[in-house]
């Protein structure tokens, strides 16, 4: 089942001096089970769009179809709990969502809230705390005694513990060390591979190149491109015009070509770049 947005607009504080357009006539369809990246300059509407996926914000006009639900401006709050069981959001600095006395209780809260038994909630919490890499000896600690990176892991375990069909993540690996970042992004890719949809809000174009199947690029609340990573990154002038960076591998490939090494294809990731260099050197295509 696809995720569909039809003529969706959102206006902040309509009719007031503070009125501002958050989303402007968005039309797109996303295939479920994919890893989708939302990109755009600061203020482009990424976080506003993310909050529409589970009706935390409802459109001012237009229609959204997601997880078997239809969301319009007239949609009430009744029944949204089940939608939010299926579609979960993890905000930037998700550690601010922590509130329980212990790590374990905090991660158990989501499953319990959505009908898990006490034993089921505990089992789910322990499973996901292990998956996010938190040590067993920390589960009875207060989450507020942990480091920032550990708190981030606990918060993410909390939204993964009830295994929503669709998870929306706003810069989830920001602030983690390089190894922690790699582990966390691989966790999300594995979650997608298990049959879920992952929607990632990010400024990190390496993550887009490495993990995304599909990209939505926003600017001033408008959808300016919906394409694969290769399509999005093939035009460096377009990227510069819209204040979007290229992946590091693409930038390095451009420097190599400027130095006279002709590379096959369009390498966007480090493995692709390494393969392209090997092929070029093997074929004697460098000058």
Curated annotation (Swiss-Prot):
Keywords (A to Z) from UniProt: ATP-binding, Cell membrane, Membrane, Nucleotide-binding, Translocase, Transport
UniProt cross-references to SUPFAM superfamilies, sorted A to Z: P-loop containing nucleoside triphosphate hydrolases
Keyword DNA-binding applies: no
Compartments (UniProt record): Cell membrane
Pfam families: ABC_tran
Any one Gene Ontology cellular component term annotated for this protein: ATP-binding cassette (ABC) transporter complex
Record membrane topology: Peripheral membrane protein
Ranges where the ABC transporter domain occurs: 3-245
Top-level lineage group: Bacteria
CDD domains: ABC_cobalt_CbiO_domain1
Top-level class of the enzyme under EC nomenclature: translocase
Gene Ontology MF terms in the entry: ATP binding; ATP hydrolysis activity; ATPase-coupled transmembrane transporter activity
EC number: 7.-.-.-
Role noted for this protein: ATP-binding (A) component of a common energy-coupling factor (ECF) ABC-transporter complex. Unlike classic ABC transporters this ECF transporter provides the energy necessary to transport a number of different substrates.
Family classification: Belongs to the ABC transporter superfamily. Energy-coupling factor EcfA family.
Subunit structure as annotated in this protein's UniProt entry: Forms a stable energy-coupling factor (ECF) transporter complex composed of 2 membrane-embedded substrate-binding proteins (S component), 2 ATP-binding proteins (A component) and 2 transmembrane proteins (T component).
Protein name per the record: Energy-coupling factor transporter ATP-binding protein EcfA2
Organism: Lactobacillus delbrueckii subsp. bulgaricus (strain ATCC 11842 / DSM 20081 / BCRC 10696 / JCM 1002 / NBRC 13953 / NCIMB 11778 / NCTC 12712 / WDCM 00102 / Lb 14)
Higher taxonomy: Bacteria, Bacillati, Bacillota, Bacilli, Lactobacillales
Gene name, Swiss-Prot/TrEMBL: ecfA2
């Amino acid at each position: 089942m696809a995720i569909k947005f039809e003529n969706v607009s959102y206006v902040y504080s309509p009719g007031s001096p503070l009125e501002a357009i958050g989303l402007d006539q968005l039309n797109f369809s996303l295939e479920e089970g994919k890893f989708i990246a939302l990109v755009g300059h600061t203020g482009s509407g990424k976080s506003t769009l993310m909050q529409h996926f589970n009706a935390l914000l409802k459109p001012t006009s237009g229609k959204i179809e997601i997880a078997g639900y239809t969301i319009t401006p007239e949609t009430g709050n009744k029944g949204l709990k089940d939608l939010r069981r299926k579609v979960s959001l993890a905000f930037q600095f998700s550690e601010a969502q922590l509130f329980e006395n212990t790590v374990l209780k905090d991660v158990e809260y989501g499953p319990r809230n959505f009908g898990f038994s006490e034993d089921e909630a505990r089992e789910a919490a322990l499973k996901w705390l292990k998956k996010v890499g938190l040590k067993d000896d920390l589960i009875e600690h207060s989450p507020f005694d942990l480091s920032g990176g550990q708190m981030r892991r606990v918060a993410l375990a909390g939204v993964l513990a009830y295994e929503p069909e669709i998870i929306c993540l706003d810069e989830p690996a920001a602030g983690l060390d390089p190894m922690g970042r790699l582990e966390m992004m691989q966790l999300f890719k594995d979650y997608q591979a298990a049959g879920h949809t992952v929607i990632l809000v990010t400024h990190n174009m390496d993550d887009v190149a490495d993990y995304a199947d599909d990209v939505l690029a926003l600017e001033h609340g408008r959808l300016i491109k919906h394409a694969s990573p290769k399509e999005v990154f093939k035009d460096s002038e377009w990227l510069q015009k819209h204040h979007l960076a290229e992946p590091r591998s693409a930038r390095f490939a451009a420097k190599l070509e400027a130095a006279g090494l002709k590379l096959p294809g369009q390498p966007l990731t480090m493995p692709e770049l390494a393969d392209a260099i090997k092929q070029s050197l093997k074929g004697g295509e460098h000058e």
